[in-house]
Amino acid sequence: MAEAEVKDNEVYEEDLVDYEEEVENGTDGGANAANASADVVKKGYVGIHSSGFRDFLLKPELLRAIQDCGFEHPSEVQHECIPQAILGMDVICQAKSGMGKTAVFVLSSLQQIDPVAGQVGALVLCHTRELAYQICHEFERFSKYLPEVKVAVFYGGVHIKKHKDLLKNDCPHIVVGTPGRILALAREKDLSLKNVRHFILDECDKMLDSLDMRRDVQEIFKMTPHDKQVMMFSATLSKEIRPVCKKFMQDPMEIYVDDEAKLTLHGLVQHYIKLSEAEKNRKLNDLLDALDFNQVVIFVKSVSRAAELNKLLCECNFPAISIHSGMTQEERLTRYKNFKEGHKRILVATDLVGRGIDIERVNIVINYDMPDSADSYLHRVGRAGRFGTKGLAITFVSSASDSDVLNQVQERFEVDIKELPEQIDTSTYMPS
């Protein structure tokens, strides 16, 4: 079968979209806080979040290709997976069809691959010819400005000599195929897998559920180097098959999407504290004194509270930095880079950074103000431990409405969030 032209797929990109966030005067419990800054007019702003692929620090060539497609708004799966995937981390992800999971491994592979003549650097396996064909063309679409990167697809139904000739005369850097054909080429030494650095299974449960196909995948896997990135994706991923997937991986980042297409994160220690509004500042001070952390993000509900709390923390000898919509885009970017580079350990922020801020060293999130929904809560606390490391989330509960949201979180995500104990084991939230 001859390779055809590219077909559409749901991959998204945007030019930093405008949002609005609440502007409110005063910190209700800020007895020790400085006076509020001048009123800030509620307005649109350009957000520092990964609502566009540019915030993932992708190659300009990839961003240009995405922009050419005219896609916007990365899906939640892309928000959560891509920052980990482009760093070479093992990933296991369950996401419904149409949620853009293909883009995760296509973009992350293209971002990382260093093409060397005659060497296959990335291998993608899937269970059908049609899917292999589609994936190959997604690679071609997004590598259109990376002419040095060669992609090829191999599957049954095509005379194997054609594939052998291609491998001999114009060896691709990225190979997509079905296990049977890939294994045949590898066994006959036409396809060398000794330089593969990215090993990807799409619709992995379909391949690993079938014993025959699983044997093929295992044999192929053993032909690749031990030191490589492994990513697995599927539209359905039962609890029974997940342990099988993990046998191929080392401490993978796990992301699962439920029936309502919302994101569920795992492995985060979560607690709440019941207190009055006036007690928040003192309790926050105590927590920052008592907890061990690399970096911490403190979420508040408005621009004025972010500015106030940041000033208060600095006055209390906690070197903090804040990001909110009352700043220019340039100032927000500068502050974000300062925090990302570790110049500051404490970030006070609004929901402006509730999505897509991916900083490996952040291991604690504190909800100084309760978010307004379970989904917002999820995205906030997901800032901690985002690269497979341990994390801790602490939420202040000071009103009946706060309790309502906390209950919604527990019901929605089937998680039991307990009150913060007097003593908490550092090993539960600090990377070893």
Swiss-Prot record:
Supply the Gene3D superfamilies for this chain.
Answer: P-loop containing nucleotide triphosphate hydrolases
UniProt cross-references to PROSITE patterns, sorted A to Z: HELICASE_ATP_BIND_1, HELICASE_CTER, Q_MOTIF
Q: Which residues form the Helicase C-terminal domain?
A: 283-428
Q: Which reaction does this enzyme catalyse, per its entry?
A: ATP + H2O = ADP + phosphate + H(+)
**One biological process GO term for this chain?**
anther development
Where on this chain is DEAD box (motif)? 202-205
Job of this protein: ATP-binding RNA helicase involved in pre-mRNA splicing. Required for the export of mRNA out of the nucleus. Required for tapetal programmed cell death (PCD) and degeneration during anther development. Forms dimer with AIP2 and binds the promoter region of the cysteine protease CP1. Can complement the yeast RNA helicase SUB2. Plants silencing AIP1 and AIP2 are male sterile.
Q: Locate the Helicase ATP-binding domain: which residues?
A: 82-255
Where is the motif Q motif annotated in this sequence? 51-79
Give the residues the record marks as binding ATP.
Answer: A95, K96, S97, G98, M99, G100, K101, T102
Report the EC code(s) recorded for this entry: 3.6.4.13
Domain notes, please? The Q motif is unique to and characteristic of the DEAD box family of RNA helicases and controls ATP binding and hydrolysis.
Instruction: Give start-end ranges for the coiled-coil region(s).
Output: 1-28
Its annotated compartments are:
Nucleus
Taxonomic superkingdom: Eukaryota
User: What is the annotated quaternary arrangement, including any partners?
Assistant: Homodimer and heterodimer with AIP2. Interacts with API5.
* Gene Ontology terms, MF aspect: ATP binding; ATP hydrolysis activity; mRNA binding; RNA helicase activity
* A single cellular component GO annotation: nucleus
**Alphabetical UniProt keywords:** ATP-binding, Coiled coil, Helicase, Hydrolase, mRNA processing, mRNA splicing, mRNA transport, Nucleotide-binding, Nucleus, RNA-binding, Transport
The name this protein goes by in its record: DEAD-box ATP-dependent RNA helicase 56
Family statement: Belongs to the DEAD box helicase family. DECD subfamily.
